[in-house]
Amino acid sequence: METLAQHRQARSSAQKVRLIVDLIRGKKVPQALNILTYTNKKAAFLVKKVVESAVANAEHNDGADIDKLRIKKIFVNEGSTMKRMMPRAKGRADRILKRTSHITVIVSDR
């Protein structure tokens, strides 16, 4: 049984989150959570929350055994970008792009 969890508008760029996602793709859930716990990045914390949510969904909705679950699919898409201005010298302004991402995790017991 496949179970999905998403975190939309995560306040980290898709490029940064993909570095973490590539570490755990295809791994068993306990091993993936262990990797995420000891990875010292903000994106690892965000991905860990989504994986834990997918595991909780699988356990509650489908009655799945946590030890048999594995990360079947995990991907990151770009979210919307918040545009901000930073004042500069001589009345000019630079544009600041605060990027977001959509994190999707699908766990399966097969």
From Swiss-Prot:
GO biological process: translation
Keywords: Ribonucleoprotein, Ribosomal protein, RNA-binding, rRNA-binding
Example of a GO cellular component annotation carried by this entry: cytosolic large ribosomal subunit
CDD domains, per database record: Ribosomal_L22
Pfam family, one: Ribosomal_L22
NCBIfam families reported for this sequence: rplV_bact (TIGR01044)
Subunit structure, interactors included: Part of the 50S ribosomal subunit.
Designated name of the protein: Large ribosomal subunit protein uL22
